[in-house]
């Protein structure tokens, strides 16, 4: 997959094409909103996305600014915060005073509304729930993803199943039908629908973790 500048260039190329379409269609653009799967440092507009190699203090704003005409503002925020804004605007959190949105994908994050405001927190890190330690002992060898993410994110579910298939030499189920290194969360859900025992075990644990995290987060409101 793409890393570092390759991802930034791809985003800039897509933005340039969209701006060209808007110009040719005589669509006026006031601003551009971008959400990223990580943290945006508001003082510098640089970003950190742990699941994108090379995006540590990455100058995404400068990359996008280079293809954007003067006068058009660029706003970058975390995906979890943007999800929450969307729910406030047109979704389940419309007119809500306090709410939490848990986003499960490659990683895990949470958008949080308190007193009608979407929170950003110290260093814009609020809602980075993937590092929540929900089960002892905390697995330091997975600190790149975090305890909660290891058990219940897309990447984590795939990693847990790969570990389980490697460890169980007698296992002959559906997940053995492809190279272990290529097993993804998609494969796990597919195997779950066919009652695969490893998929069932891993996904039941993920559901348990989602429930625990939801209960803990709600208690903060």
Tell where the protein language model's regions lie, with residue ranges:
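Residue-level signal for inorganic ion chemistry
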Residues: 34, 157, 210
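Short, acidic, Ser/Thr-enriched surface-loop or helix-capping motifs
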Residues: 42, 113, 220
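Glycine-rich phosphate-binding loop and adjoining helix at the ATP-binding site
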Residues: 1-12, 16, 20-32, 38-98
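Phosphate/ATP-binding catalytic cores across multiple sugar-kinase/actin-like superfamilies
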Residues: 14-21, 201-221
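Short glycine-rich anion-binding loops that position phosphate/pyrophosphate groups of nucleotides
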Residues: 37-40, 105-107
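Surface-exposed helix-capping loop/turn segments at secondary-structure junctions
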Residues: 20-27, 167-173, 216-221
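Glycine/GP-enriched mid-protein hinge/lid loop-to-helix segment characteristic of carbohydrate kinases
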Residues: 1-4, 68, 73-75, 89-205, ...
